[in-house]
UniProtKB/Swiss-Prot annotation:
The gene is FUB7. Disulfide bonds: none annotated. Sulfhydrylase; part of the gene cluster that mediates the biosynthesis of fusaric acid, a mycotoxin with low to moderate toxicity to animals and humans, but with high phytotoxic properties. L-aspartate is suggested as fusaric acid amino acid precursor that is activated and further processed to O-acetyl-L-homoserine by cluster enzymes aspartate kinase FUB3 and homoserine O-acetyltransferase FUB5, as well as enzymes of the primary metabolism. Its EC number is 2.5.1.-. Its cofactor is pyridoxal 5'-phosphate. This is Sulfhydrylase FUB7.
Length: 433
């Protein structure tokens, strides 16, 4: 495909990264169900293992089906390359483990998905990597948190579940002034449809591909995208592993050999090699099928979410509505600036009543599913206080934007009138009105 000619999202989601293979001319991406690949000869194998030549060695490192998925996501996000992982949590862990080591820290917004907060706050400190959480969105607070051991700033493009949209350009400027990359979890950005963080200064983008990218609740997967814009050589004092001789490859210097692709190369040839959190070709094929309709789904998701938000704003059973497209949202001005193709596919509401009211409303839904996922074509709802953020302390939950009365809703592509009717009947059961 001549990707330099065809650059529109809806075209890239169907064609980027794949040309029919010369053997079968298959128009669909084949599933390469193989663990390993035959070398031309021993010398060829030696060149591959020594990174003197790029090619397939073992499917833990790369696989032709997975390769198409990686190239397609990189194209959609505007990066130079991508590496697929077994899950979004794996993508996040491998990214941070590549940037930081024992004794280092990262600076992160406190407005995060519960699993992310737990990984940063509980798991990574066991490896000697600490996180400094910034509760406000103030740029000066991000700057104040950075010290000589800081290796990245980490934010979500729309935080889950309170949909805070950060000032990407302002935070990126601060990160770059201090010689560190900005890492953005763009899961809620739907594969780059609602926002492409790289265009606003992000250096690395991660996704849970399980969500809108796959789009049908069938497959667990993650992906890391490298913008190729961060100069690791310039900031070698913070990132010596990017430029100094690597003990893994007989003194190979990544920056010297791979330049702008240094970070994503280390992800592949060190992290995927040593940690093994790779994506299977079967999962890659499922995710590729999802990507083909991503733009169409994302458009309908956003339309339905806006209409559902207006319904909730007029409901006597709802105390408040959190939706980034609402003028009452704390970061509406930033959402309006950065989310140019719709305000996403999620919203949260606060229901009236005691602490059990949220659970009662969720339990009364018939069409909307009560489960721990987002980004499905079907509508989903959950009570975060007692589920996704339950492992956090009360103070940590509040810092993440989670309250007892909150219901988080991932709005699907059903007819919006039916989604509204389902909430209406559940409110009737819970409140009698």
């Amino acid at each position: 495909m001549a990707e330099q000619v065809f650059q529109n999202f809806e075209t890239l989601q169907l064609h980027a990264g794949y040309t029919p293979d010369p053997h079968t001319r298959s128009t669909a991406v084949p599933i390469y169900a193989t663990s390993s690949y035959t070398f031309n000869d021993s010398a060829h194998g030696a060149r591959l293992f020594g990174l003197k030549e790029l090619g397939n060695i073992y499917s833990r490192l790369m696989n032709p089906t997975v390769d198409v998925f990686e190239k397609r996501i990189a194209a959609l996000e505007g990066g130079i390359a991508a590496a697929a992982t077994s899950s979004g949590q794996a993508a996040q862990f491998l990214t941070i483990a590549t940037l930081a080591k024992a004794g280092d820290n990262i600076v992160a917004s406190s407005h995060l998905y519960g699993g992310t907060y737990n990984q940063l706050n509980v798991l990574l400190p066991r490896f000697g990597i600490k996180t400094k959480f910034v509760r406000s969105g103030k740029l000066e607070d991000y700057a104040a948190a950075i010290d000589d051991q800081t290796r990245a700033i980490y934010v979500e493009s729309m935080s889950n579940p309170d949909y805070v949209v950060p000032d990407f350009e302002g935070i990126a400027k601060i990160a770059h002034e201090h010689g560190i990359p900005l890492v953005v979890d763009n899961t809620l950005g739907a594969g780059g449809y609602y926002i492409r963080p790289i265009e606003h200064g992000a250096d690395i983008v991660v996704h849970s591909a399980t969500k809108w990218i796959g789009g049908h609740g069938t497959t667990i997967g993650g992906v890391i995208v490298d913008s190729g814009r961060f100069n690791w050589n310039k900031h070698s004092d913070r990132f010596p592993e990017m430029v100094e001789p690597s003990p893994s490859y007989h003194g190979l210097k990544y920056w010297e050999a791979f330049g702008p692709a240094t970070f994503i190369t280390r992800i592949r040839v060190e992290m995927l090699r040593d940690i093994g959190a790779c994506l299977s070709p079967f999962s890659a094929q499922q995710l590729l099928l999802g990507i083909e309709t991503l733009g169409l789904r994302a458009e309908r998701h956003a339309q339905n979410t806006e209409k559902l938000s207006k319904y909730f704003e007029s409901s006597p059973n709802v105390s408040w509505v959190l939706w980034p497209g609402s003028e009452s949202h704390p970061t509406y001005s930033q959402a309006k600036k950065y989310l140019t193709r719709g305000f996403g596919a999620m919203l949260s509401i606060g229901v009236k009543g005691d602490a059990s009211a949220g659970s009662k409303v969720v339990d009364g839904l018939k069409l909307v599913s009560n489960l721990a996922n987002v980004g499905d074509a079907k509508s989903l709802a959950i009570h975060p206080w007692s589920t996704t953020h339950e492992q956090l302390s009360e103070d940590e939950r509040l810092a993440s934007g989670v309250t007892e009365d909150m219901i988080r809703i991932s709005v699907g592509i059903e007819h919006v009138d039916d989604i509204i009717a389902d909430f209406e009947q559940s409110f009737q059961k819970a409140y009698g009105s």
